[in-house]
Amino acid sequence: MSETLSNIVSKNMTNDKNSLESMNISSSSSAEENPKKQAKKXKERGPDPSANPFHLSGDVDFFLLRDQERNKALSERQQQKTMRVHEKMTYSSKVLAKHTSLRRQLQLEDKQEDLEARTEADHLRAFRDYNTWKLTLTKEKNVEPENMSGYLKQKRQMFLLQYTLDCKRREIQRLETLATKEEARLQQAEKSLAKDAALFDEFLRENDCSSVQAMKAAEKETKAKIEKILEIRDLTTQIVNIKSEISRFEDTLQHYKVYKDFLYKLSPKEWLEEQEKKHLFLKNAKEISEASKDGSVNSTPGDKGPGIKGKASSVWAKEGQGTKKPWRFLRLGRSLSYLSSPQQGSQPSESSGGNSRGSNSPIPLTQEDTDSDGEEPQLYFTEPQQLLDVFRELEEQNLSLIQNRQEMEETLEELSRTLKHTQIRMDREVNQLKQWVSTMMMSITKEEDTAAELELKARVFHFGEYKGDQQDKLLESLNWKVLDVYRNCIGTQQEANLGTVQMLTIIEHQLDELLENLERVPQVKIEQAERAKEKERRIRLREEKLQMQKILQEERLQRARARAQAEIKKKRGRTLVCRSQPPVHRIKQESEHTLMDKEKEELLFFFT
């Protein structure tokens, strides 16, 4: 019995041990899983200030969340106002960014869940391996009996585990009650939101009604405004039409005034003087009548003389006033008849044009004076034929003047043409004479040079025939010339009171050296030097020619000035001219000094 009891107790202990181990493993696994879940909840809900992990966070307040979202939207709106264009984001880009962030978070959560599932599978696999290993080890082995202390220890552990389970159940119940309370609170908040939505809908309805009324009132006001604008437009068109008619009438009035001035200018002076006298007489009579009227008003009833004068003046004034209005109507009728029938408006236009303007007329009779005097203004031309006669006379005068002017122009053109031809001929002759003078001067200078050379040669050939003084002078001049050549060719460094012959020998040696060097110089450099010398010679000749031309121009100007200042000699009668003789045929003679001229040119070319 004892053996059986011990076997049973040992079996129970082993079972209890296995159960305890399984509970420990499950508790350990649950303990490992709980921190992960708590960490996950803490990640989802945020940090909890209290130490109790089963306490609800403050983020559950939906009203607070709504306020936070509203403040966040306001801050984002203010930030959008301050941001630049390239820094702003559209709604689609924001939504895409949110979607990408949510997708990334979901991917991370999926990865974490996969890792957790893998770890749990690894734990289960290890536990299964451990149980199988334990069964294989304990199989067919005698299990040693355990003592009471181990058994009590196991029971204590079981009790503690049961206690923890009860605590967790109570905490779960408490959390469920809190969840029900929060759900009730949320339902109440939903009801308040529904009430707020109903109030907001009512406000929107009232706002729509007020906006409809405002739109109707605005439409009425716009209709009234459009009607007023149309009325104003009609009135403005009428004003513009009236102004255009006024301007048209003013233009016609100006035309008539121009015609009137023209007719007054064509009228004779005697008639104008008569009209001026008549106007002055009427003006004086009017002044006398006004003065007599004033005297009759101020006089007593017994005074008959002044009263009679006042009556006469009043009758005169009435007649003037009576003739004033008909004249105005007559003028208007004439203008209308001129506008209606232009083909019959020659005489009426003349009369109305002559009567429409008097301010710019050459006589003192004006339109205001005629209106004030009450009499119709008169014109000298009563028939168109009179005006045509005046036109014919003026046309004849103009034709005669035009003919005289044409004759004068023809004579002037002939004179200018002859003057031009004579000027051209004189200029040509002057240029020819100048060329002849220049050629003669050049030939004279050449002849003088050749004569001087011949004279020098003759003196040299006839050296013994001259006297000693002349020879000394000639030798001295020759010495000076040789010295000048020596200084120009060799310089003043080697000059030490040399004689003429010595200087000539030195010049000859220098010339030989130069000729030898010249033979050694390449042909290209010689050609360049020749070109340079030729260019200098041409420039010098051009300058001399320009100087000669300037001198000739000055002489010509002096002669012209003297000719202009001299007295004009009037030729009387024909000039005596001798008979013309046939021209003499001159034979051209070749100059004997061409060789000498060539030598001079070579000397000038190479030694200047």
Curated annotation (Swiss-Prot):
<comment type="similarity">
    <text>Belongs to the CFAP100 family.</text>
</comment>
<feature type="region of interest" description="Disordered">
    <location>
        <begin position="1"/>
        <end position="57"/>
    </location>
</feature>
<dbReference type="GO" id="GO:0003341">
    <property type="term" value="P:cilium movement"/>
</dbReference>
<keyword id="KW-0206">Cytoskeleton</keyword>
<keyword id="KW-0966">Cell projection</keyword>
<feature type="coiled-coil region">
    <location>
        <begin position="385"/>
        <end position="435"/>
    </location>
</feature>
<feature type="coiled-coil region">
    <location>
        <begin position="230"/>
        <end position="257"/>
    </location>
</feature>
<keyword id="KW-0969">Cilium</keyword>
<dbReference type="GO" id="GO:0070840">
    <property type="term" value="F:dynein complex binding"/>
</dbReference>
<keyword id="KW-0175">Coiled coil</keyword>
<feature type="coiled-coil region">
    <location>
        <begin position="500"/>
        <end position="575"/>
    </location>
</feature>
<dbReference type="InterPro" id="IPR051147">
    <property type="entry name" value="CFAP_domain-containing"/>
</dbReference>
<dbReference type="GO" id="GO:0097545">
    <property type="term" value="C:axonemal doublet microtubule"/>
</dbReference>
<dbReference type="GO" id="GO:0036159">
    <property type="term" value="P:inner dynein arm assembly"/>
</dbReference>
<feature type="region of interest" description="Disordered">
    <location>
        <begin position="339"/>
        <end position="377"/>
    </location>
</feature>
<comment type="function">
    <text>May play a role in ciliary/flagellar motility by regulating the assembly and the activity of axonemal inner dynein arm.</text>
</comment>
<dbReference type="InterPro" id="IPR025252">
    <property type="entry name" value="DUF4200"/>
</dbReference>
<feature type="compositionally biased region" description="Low complexity">
    <location>
        <begin position="20"/>
        <end position="32"/>
    </location>
</feature>
<keyword id="KW-0963">Cytoplasm</keyword>
<feature type="region of interest" description="Disordered">
    <location>
        <begin position="291"/>
        <end position="320"/>
    </location>
</feature>
<feature type="compositionally biased region" description="Polar residues">
    <location>
        <begin position="1"/>
        <end position="17"/>
    </location>
</feature>
<dbReference type="GO" id="GO:0031514">
    <property type="term" value="C:motile cilium"/>
</dbReference>
<feature type="coiled-coil region">
    <location>
        <begin position="164"/>
        <end position="196"/>
    </location>
</feature>
<dbReference type="Pfam" id="PF13863">
    <property type="entry name" value="DUF4200"/>
</dbReference>
<dbReference type="GO" id="GO:0036064">
    <property type="term" value="C:ciliary basal body"/>
</dbReference>
<feature type="compositionally biased region" description="Low complexity">
    <location>
        <begin position="339"/>
        <end position="361"/>
    </location>
</feature>
<protein>
    <recommendedName>
        <fullName>Cilia- and flagella-associated protein 100</fullName>
    </recommendedName>
</protein>
